[in-house]
Amino acid sequence: QLTAILRGVDTWPDDYELVAAAFGDSPYATYTKVIHAPEREGEPVSVILSGMREVNQVEICAVNRLRKRIVTFYQTDFTLQEDTLFVDAGTLDVSISNGVQQQVFNTDCIGCHGASTFAAANLFLTEGKSEAALVGVPSTRSEAGKLLVAPGSPDESFLMDVLTHPEAVRHDHVDILSAKPDKLTLLEDWIESIKTNL
Protein backbone atom coordinates (compact mmCIF):
# COMPACT_ATOMS: atom_id res chain seq x y z
CA GLN A 1 0.00 0.00 0.00
CA LEU A 2 1.46 3.32 -1.14
CA THR A 3 0.26 6.46 0.66
CA ALA A 4 1.10 10.09 -0.08
CA ILE A 5 -0.22 13.63 0.05
CA LEU A 6 -0.14 14.83 -3.54
CA ARG A 7 -0.37 18.36 -4.88
CA GLY A 8 -1.08 19.09 -8.55
CA VAL A 9 -2.73 15.80 -9.50
CA ASP A 10 -5.29 17.48 -11.75
CA THR A 11 -2.79 19.61 -13.72
CA TRP A 12 -1.90 16.86 -16.21
CA PRO A 13 -3.43 16.85 -19.72
CA ASP A 14 -5.42 13.86 -20.98
CA ASP A 15 -2.42 12.31 -22.78
CA TYR A 16 -0.90 11.44 -19.39
CA GLU A 17 -1.95 9.61 -16.27
CA LEU A 18 -0.59 10.10 -12.80
CA VAL A 19 -0.17 6.59 -11.44
CA ALA A 20 1.24 4.35 -8.81
CA ALA A 21 3.24 1.98 -10.99
CA ALA A 22 5.49 -1.03 -10.83
CA PHE A 23 8.47 -1.36 -13.14
CA GLY A 24 10.87 -4.11 -14.07
CA ASP A 25 13.89 -3.29 -16.23
CA SER A 26 11.86 -1.42 -18.85
CA PRO A 27 10.69 2.21 -18.87
CA TYR A 28 7.18 0.83 -19.49
CA ALA A 29 5.09 0.10 -16.40
CA THR A 30 4.22 -3.52 -15.72
CA TYR A 31 1.36 -2.56 -13.41
CA THR A 32 -0.39 0.77 -12.94
CA LYS A 33 -3.15 2.18 -10.81
CA VAL A 34 -4.44 5.65 -11.71
CA ILE A 35 -4.27 8.25 -8.96
CA HIS A 36 -7.20 10.66 -8.90
CA ALA A 37 -7.19 14.06 -7.20
CA PRO A 38 -8.38 13.80 -3.60
CA GLU A 39 -11.71 15.36 -2.66
CA ARG A 40 -9.92 17.88 -0.44
CA GLU A 41 -6.47 19.39 -1.00
CA GLY A 42 -3.97 17.93 1.44
CA GLU A 43 -5.94 14.72 1.95
CA PRO A 44 -3.76 11.57 1.76
CA VAL A 45 -4.19 9.24 -1.20
CA SER A 46 -3.67 5.49 -0.78
CA VAL A 47 -3.14 3.04 -3.61
CA ILE A 48 -2.78 -0.72 -3.46
CA LEU A 49 -0.83 -2.58 -6.14
CA SER A 50 -1.26 -6.33 -6.00
CA GLY A 51 -0.22 -9.44 -7.90
CA MET A 52 3.11 -7.99 -8.94
CA ARG A 53 5.76 -10.28 -10.40
CA GLU A 54 9.12 -9.48 -12.00
CA VAL A 55 9.10 -5.99 -10.55
CA ASN A 56 12.01 -4.17 -8.92
CA GLN A 57 10.65 -0.64 -8.40
CA VAL A 58 7.41 0.98 -7.31
CA GLU A 59 6.87 4.61 -8.25
CA ILE A 60 4.49 7.52 -8.23
CA CYS A 61 4.94 8.87 -11.72
CA ALA A 62 3.35 10.30 -14.83
CA VAL A 63 3.07 7.90 -17.76
CA ASN A 64 1.97 8.45 -21.33
CA ARG A 65 -0.73 6.47 -23.14
CA LEU A 66 1.71 3.61 -23.74
CA ARG A 67 2.41 3.46 -19.99
CA LYS A 68 5.94 4.72 -20.58
CA ARG A 69 7.45 6.53 -17.61
CA ILE A 70 7.70 10.27 -18.35
CA VAL A 71 8.40 11.77 -14.90
CA THR A 72 9.11 10.03 -11.60
CA PHE A 73 8.07 11.85 -8.42
CA TYR A 74 8.74 9.05 -5.94
CA GLN A 75 10.55 5.75 -6.27
CA THR A 76 11.35 2.87 -3.97
CA ASP A 77 12.95 -0.51 -4.54
CA PHE A 78 10.63 -3.50 -4.38
CA THR A 79 11.24 -7.15 -3.57
CA LEU A 80 8.49 -9.74 -3.68
CA GLN A 81 7.13 -10.66 -0.26
CA GLU A 82 4.05 -12.32 1.16
CA ASP A 83 3.01 -9.54 3.54
CA THR A 84 1.62 -6.20 2.46
CA LEU A 85 4.32 -3.58 2.12
CA PHE A 86 3.30 -0.18 3.51
CA VAL A 87 5.08 2.84 2.02
CA ASP A 88 4.53 6.47 3.03
CA ALA A 89 5.85 8.70 0.25
CA GLY A 90 5.22 11.90 2.21
CA THR A 91 4.03 15.09 0.51
CA LEU A 92 4.82 15.40 -3.20
CA ASP A 93 4.34 18.10 -5.82
CA VAL A 94 3.16 16.02 -8.79
CA SER A 95 2.12 18.95 -10.99
CA ILE A 96 3.07 19.07 -14.66
CA SER A 97 5.08 22.23 -13.87
CA ASN A 98 7.18 20.35 -11.33
CA GLY A 99 7.46 17.45 -13.79
CA VAL A 100 8.97 19.79 -16.39
CA GLN A 101 11.29 21.26 -13.75
CA GLN A 102 12.53 17.84 -12.62
CA GLN A 103 12.61 16.02 -15.95
CA VAL A 104 13.72 18.78 -18.34
CA PHE A 105 15.14 21.88 -16.69
CA ASN A 106 17.03 20.15 -13.85
CA THR A 107 18.48 17.43 -16.06
CA ASP A 108 19.15 19.23 -19.34
CA CYS A 109 19.20 23.01 -18.81
CA ILE A 110 20.44 24.28 -15.46
CA GLY A 111 24.08 23.40 -16.16
CA CYS A 112 24.16 26.59 -18.25
CA HIS A 113 21.07 28.31 -16.87
CA GLY A 114 21.62 28.84 -13.18
CA ALA A 115 23.13 25.83 -11.37
CA SER A 116 26.12 28.01 -10.49
CA THR A 117 26.01 31.75 -9.85
CA PHE A 118 25.83 32.34 -13.62
CA ALA A 119 22.91 31.90 -16.01
CA ALA A 120 23.42 32.07 -19.77
CA ALA A 121 21.38 34.92 -21.29
CA ASN A 122 20.50 35.76 -17.67
CA LEU A 123 17.85 33.03 -17.88
CA PHE A 124 17.58 31.09 -14.63
CA LEU A 125 15.84 27.73 -15.08
CA THR A 126 16.43 26.54 -11.53
CA GLU A 127 13.67 25.52 -9.13
CA GLY A 128 11.64 28.43 -7.90
CA LYS A 129 12.85 30.71 -10.70
CA SER A 130 12.12 29.01 -14.02
CA GLU A 131 8.40 29.70 -14.35
CA ALA A 132 8.76 33.40 -13.51
CA ALA A 133 11.70 33.68 -15.92
CA LEU A 134 9.78 32.07 -18.80
CA VAL A 135 5.99 32.39 -18.67
CA GLY A 136 4.70 35.55 -20.29
CA VAL A 137 8.21 37.05 -20.51
CA PRO A 138 9.17 38.70 -23.82
CA SER A 139 12.26 37.21 -25.44
CA THR A 140 15.12 39.62 -25.99
CA ARG A 141 16.34 37.42 -28.86
CA SER A 142 13.18 36.73 -30.86
CA GLU A 143 13.05 38.77 -34.06
CA ALA A 144 9.30 38.09 -34.20
CA GLY A 145 8.81 39.51 -30.70
CA LYS A 146 7.67 36.19 -29.19
CA LEU A 147 7.30 35.47 -25.50
CA LEU A 148 9.72 32.91 -24.08
CA VAL A 149 6.66 30.87 -23.10
CA ALA A 150 3.30 32.00 -24.44
CA PRO A 151 0.66 30.43 -22.15
CA GLY A 152 -1.39 27.89 -24.08
CA SER A 153 0.64 28.23 -27.29
CA PRO A 154 3.81 26.20 -27.91
CA ASP A 155 4.00 27.48 -31.51
CA GLU A 156 4.18 31.07 -30.25
CA SER A 157 6.76 30.25 -27.57
CA PHE A 158 10.36 31.19 -28.33
CA LEU A 159 11.55 28.42 -25.98
CA MET A 160 10.27 25.83 -28.46
CA ASP A 161 11.96 27.68 -31.35
CA VAL A 162 15.28 27.58 -29.47
CA LEU A 163 14.95 23.82 -28.88
CA THR A 164 13.82 22.90 -32.40
CA HIS A 165 15.45 25.42 -34.80
CA PRO A 166 19.27 25.64 -34.90
CA GLU A 167 19.26 29.23 -36.15
CA ALA A 168 17.00 30.58 -33.37
CA VAL A 169 19.89 31.74 -31.17
CA ARG A 170 23.66 32.02 -31.49
CA HIS A 171 24.34 28.87 -29.44
CA ASP A 172 22.52 25.91 -31.04
CA HIS A 173 20.26 24.20 -28.46
CA VAL A 174 18.64 21.66 -30.83
CA ASP A 175 20.90 18.78 -29.81
CA ILE A 176 19.93 19.12 -26.15
CA LEU A 177 16.53 17.42 -26.54
CA SER A 178 16.58 16.15 -30.14
CA ALA A 179 17.12 12.55 -29.01
CA LYS A 180 14.52 12.95 -26.24
CA PRO A 181 11.16 13.41 -27.99
CA ASP A 182 9.21 12.60 -24.81
CA LYS A 183 10.77 15.66 -23.15
CA LEU A 184 9.93 17.94 -26.08
CA THR A 185 6.36 16.67 -26.00
CA LEU A 186 6.22 17.22 -22.23
CA LEU A 187 7.38 20.83 -22.69
CA GLU A 188 4.76 21.44 -25.39
CA ASP A 189 2.03 19.91 -23.24
CA TRP A 190 3.13 21.99 -20.23
CA ILE A 191 2.95 25.18 -22.29
CA GLU A 192 -0.52 24.21 -23.55
CA SER A 193 -1.66 23.52 -19.98
CA ILE A 194 -0.45 26.82 -18.54
CA LYS A 195 -3.53 28.73 -19.63
CA THR A 196 -5.76 26.41 -17.63
CA ASN A 197 -3.43 25.91 -14.65
CA LEU A 198 -2.75 29.57 -13.78
Spell out what each predicted region is.
Residues Q1-V45, G51-L198:
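Aromatic- and Gly/Pro-enriched helix-to-coil junctions and flexible linker segments
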